[in-house]
């Protein structure tokens, strides 16, 4: 080493005795550096106590040359040590090395600019961060604390003292002439270029980048110490090729994914989204590409750090000269556990070699940094949970109330990405394989065409066709339900996939290669379930409306029954439904148990804060669901209850209506006789009623509709006794009452159009019908009085029904009498006020003080908002009625700018169905109960299979 001549440390003004003592220590340090050059490279132990906090970290002794402007700081550190030791002098000879404490990211960049001596930029960083004389004057270490010499404040930890002194230095710097205010942002990140004014903020930002990357250049003995990390200055970092995932866009905070084009406002969700494009597993023979600029590569791609962290590592050669820093960036995407072979390589018997020690140290440090990042992520989520903040998915932006649901959702993204990668790989077989079988197939095709005279589309011989047909017949005979499956497109796709696989990889035995098909399907059932679950979650979470409709309906098949949970929302001009879960019903299930099951399933797909309207049947108690949102009753179930309560044998016997009981029995016998099924005579309506409609009513209406055909049939069969016992007059009167009821049920169960706005008009229409028929004499009058009582008791009209009726521009307030107009308008305004907070765009962050100030002026603003909402409702009601039946969603899409609040309310309420049961519920319940009785699948697998059946196709 060469000693600089004429170097003098700055002296402190007004310090006589301490100045002489500092000069003696400085001369002693210079002599020790000269002697270290003669004595040899063996290090001499030295003690350095910077602070109580740094003392717990790993100490690495680095031989280096110390510039003169650094000597003064070493002197006051030695003085503090001597003062703490009670004036006891140190050893006779000053050590030739300087102990640099490394072991945390906070030690890589200090306030005064010192960097580890292995870093080639230590001098430049020092020259940038060394300020005025304030730092040298400020420190007074006494009685275990650091005292500021400027203002007298005391600090226990050295880092806190540094931050305080920096404030004095910044104040002096900004008070001078020619100093720009932008110089306060002096801490610049060398990874992404962001600038920070305060060191603590800069340090937290560096924690997101910092991770040790072990360089593989050179021999093991030439490798640098794995803990020798330096901070690379911004102006001295070599230009590198852009990373595969980088910030694209202006400086306004727009981050665009270059794979799928999604845009993010914040960098962290963008990073998490980009990580999802990474392959889940790395091929065994994969090696990272070499960097053309730095020539460095990642030694172990399976143990590459997370893309959240990027590290800069410096190296020194054996000659002691400072080599240029090489910034090593690992291009792998996800942190993966190394395979067993690599784990054994890391634990080689030759653990005493420099290479094994360096590798072990590197792995230890990487694990520590990864663990620190994971703990930081968990603490962040824990704090957000304590503050009642939702967990947000960085890939799609969906929010979850519980952290476990977020983890499961992220695994679904990973499974979806894995499936896309594997499917793409399977669709593109190697070219060599195609060259092997394609010419052969063409040759066989040509031979068959020329020899047997078959067309190119009939290359299979007739004998093979007969064999295939025989196998198909065996499958059909084994299960009659396979008749529609074999001719379906999914079975054809399966057969084509088997043929293509055999063509690619040669003829093979399906049983030997694929094994049991049921086992194969169940093995991949969770992966397929997660893929479809991600799509359903994204569809429900990205809903432009601020609410959904949820139906929980029980369907009975014989003695068994099950619950089906379905979510509805408006997507464009259509209503989209998603079956979320299927659960077997039990007699012991109460309303609270069903409610808990519904809430648990919904928490996996949507946030609990989302506005929800529940539609349940008569078996589910509405009291439990009313706590979570508005709860309505299925309109078909309500009308069915009306009919059953009136036409039940117990009620008719109590009212002495024996002729009605006899009529119902005769109609049921006629409809159930051999050859007189419903399919024989047809039905009056093309659209079938929902599965929760009463079958007794259908029998009566069927006999009335096809009375002439039934009489002709029985006259030929010479069985006129049943026809003679039929009361034709009473049958006609009952049909006149029940036909409008069934027609209303069919209208309310329409699956392609909004139906909630029809509930109140249906109630008014049926009430008028029963009132008019009640004035007649005889049995019909008694029945109509019973129907009126049952209608008021079972067919409830809720405020949501009234609001939905107003949202129909063809009806508005026309179906109801004028004295109810003000009541319905007030209900509309109340519902708008309840959900208007959800419509407002929330700010990213609002301080508590600002919220407190805004609370004082909330009352006048709320009154103004209520007035505007009521004026909007009156303006809408003054518009003329539509003469033709409009498409409601298309109408509200056109008037969104004119009636903003009503339009948002319409896209929520009009998507809620009036009837909870659908036409496909019966088939789904039959299959679910069949699986349950035969014990083919577990309840969990059965639920996943039903979910796939409903949402995948």
From Swiss-Prot:
Cellular location(s): Nucleus; Chromosome
Gene: Znf618
Zinc finger (C2H2-type): 146-168, 187-209, 255-277, 391-413
CC per GO annotation: nucleus; pericentric heterochromatin
InterPro entries according to UniProt: RNaseH-like_sf, Znf_C2H2_sf, Znf_C2H2_type
Span list, region Disordered: 1-56, 283-305, 337-390, 419-461
Family: Belongs to the krueppel C2H2-type zinc-finger protein family.
Record PTM N-acetylmethionine, positions in chain: 1
One of the record's GO molecular function terms: chromatin-protein adaptor activity
Regions of compositional bias (Polar residues) in chain numbering: 339-354, 419-428, 441-458
Record's keyword terms, sorted: Acetylation, Chromosome, DNA-binding, Isopeptide bond, Metal-binding, Nucleus, Repeat, Transcription, Transcription regulation, Ubl conjugation, Zinc, Zinc-finger
PROSITE patterns for the chain: ZINC_FINGER_C2H2_1, ZINC_FINGER_C2H2_2
Lineage: superkingdom: Eukaryota
Record's function text: Regulates UHRF2 function as a specific 5-hydroxymethylcytosine (5hmC) reader by regulating its chromatin localization.
Quaternary assembly: Interacts with UHRF2.
Compositional bias annotation for Basic and acidic residues: 365-379
Protein name (Swiss-Prot/TrEMBL): Zinc finger protein 618
Covalent cross-link (Glycyl lysine isopeptide (Lys-Gly) (interchain with G-Cter in SUMO2)), residues: 63, 81, 238, 436
